[in-house]
Amino acid sequence: MMASYPEPEDTAGTLLAPESGRAVKEAEASPPSPGKGGGTTPEKPDPAQKPPYSYVALIAMAIRESAEKRLTLSGIYQYIIAKFPFYEKNKKGWQNSIRHNLSLNECFIKVPREGGGERKGNYWTLDPACEDMFEKGNYRRRRRMKRPFRPPPAHFQPGKGLFGSGGAAGGCGVPGAGADGYGYLAPPKYLQSGFLNNSWPLPQPPSPMPYASCQMAAAAAAAAAAAAAAGPGSPGAAAVVKGLAGPAASYGPYSRVQSMALPPGVVNSYNGLGGPPAAPPPPPPPPHPHPHPHAHHLHAAAAPPPAPPHHGAAAPPPGQLSPASPATAAPPAPAPTSAPGLQFACARQPELAMMHCSYWDHDSKTGALHSRLDL
């Protein structure tokens, strides 16, 4: 009896049969992998879920994927809505954020339309310095970019004022008003008297010379020149000098005639002959007889004696001051034409405590010299 053995080929086929069936089942269960030629596209984002991109990334994405690398504001809106359906809702909120980022972010540049006309809206493009602000095209990771230097406007440059350098307005320097770092004029700082205590005395600065005093000094020079041309003995010269002494009392406790620089030809009451005084003159010496002559006696010798007092009043003795009332005061006599100077008398000024101008009368009987105040 002969035993039959299976051939080797049949045995190999029997052993491989279960493995091939198992591989077919695994191939049917596994999904097909996407190929290079005709693979499946990734699924669209969920409309209910907000995309994980910032507004700057959305704007940059829309501009980069455009054909001309620039878009209008409405074009940016349309791209975002078509790319991410989540933004179809609540358009007012996110569109305001898009406009806000376009205006304030320096990586977006506004480009006006060509030709202008009735078409509104400008183009927006990316700054060439900010092309690589996203790392390798990943819009979720943004690099920190250094802002490009842009000079400030001309009227806000530090160190320059609105009207010129140094805080001067219109070429005239304003004392106490300086320009700060951005060109604004700081108001002058004054010390208000309402916040001061009376028990704390503060030194007061000297008051500047008023504008009227400057005008009066110029008028005095012109009037003196006119008086010298008319002659020292003319009544108009005395009136001019008397008029100059009147308004000066309202600017200070002392008369301005004393401090004015009188030209030669006009005699001051304290220094005998004319000339600009370098310093305030000393008070007049007490009248007493002088055995020796002075320069101011030359033109005072021809003055008439004083008028007799009215109402029976006794005449004062020689060498003594006698106050004269406005009714009894004798008018000053004009000096002779040969005298070197011109006499004048101060007008009545009630607010002054004392008079700084006087004229000299010569007594022909006794020869004594005394002065009178014309109040």
UniProtKB/Swiss-Prot annotation:
Give a short account of its post-translational modification: Sumoylated with SUMO1; sumoylation is required for transcriptional repression activity.
**Residues involved in crosslink (Glycyl lysine isopeptide (Lys-Gly) (interchain with G-Cter in SUMO))?**
25
- Where are residues bearing Phosphoserine located in the sequence? 33
Xref: Pfam families: Forkhead (PF00250)
Annotated region of DNA binding: 50-144
The molecular function terms of the Gene Ontology recorded here are: cysteine-type endopeptidase regulator activity involved in apoptotic process; DNA binding; DNA-binding transcription activator activity, RNA polymerase II-specific; DNA-binding transcription factor activity; nuclear estrogen receptor binding; RNA polymerase II cis-regulatory region sequence-specific DNA binding; ubiquitin conjugating enzyme binding
Q: Which residues form the signal peptide?
A: none
Task: Quote the SUPFAM superfamilies the UniProt record gives.
Answer: Winged helix' DNA-binding domain
Q: Where is this region: Disordered?
A: 1-50, 272-341
In which tissues is this gene expressed? Expressed in the mesenchyme of developing eyelids. Expressed in ovaries throughout development and adulthood, localized to the undifferentiated granulosa cells in small and medium follicles as well as cumulus cells of preovulatory follicles. Expressed in the pituitary.
Q: Which GO terms describe its biological process?
A: apoptotic DNA fragmentation; embryonic eye morphogenesis; extraocular skeletal muscle development; female gonad development; female somatic sex determination; granulosa cell differentiation; negative regulation of DNA-templated transcription; negative regulation of gene expression
Ranges of biased composition (kind: Pro residues): 277-288, 303-320
Single GO cellular component term: nucleus
InterPro entries, alphabetized = FH_FOXL2 (IPR047515), Fork_head_dom (IPR001766), FOX_domain-containing (IPR050211), TF_fork_head_CS_1 (IPR018122), TF_fork_head_CS_2 (IPR030456), WH-like_DNA-bd_sf (IPR036388), WH_DNA-bd_sf (IPR036390)
Write out the function statement from the record. Transcriptional regulator. Critical factor essential for ovary differentiation and maintenance, and repression of the genetic program for somatic testis determination. Prevents trans-differentiation of ovary to testis through transcriptional repression of the Sertoli cell-promoting gene SOX9. Has apoptotic activity in ovarian cells. Suppresses ESR1-mediated transcription of PTGS2/COX2 stimulated by tamoxifen. Activates SIRT1 transcription under cellular stress conditions. Activates transcription of OSR2. Is a regulator of CYP19 expression. Is a transcriptional repressor of STAR.
The record's subunit annotation is: Interacts with ESR1. Interacts with UBE2I/UBC9. Interacts with SMAD3. Interacts with DDX20.
Name the record gives this protein: Forkhead box protein L2
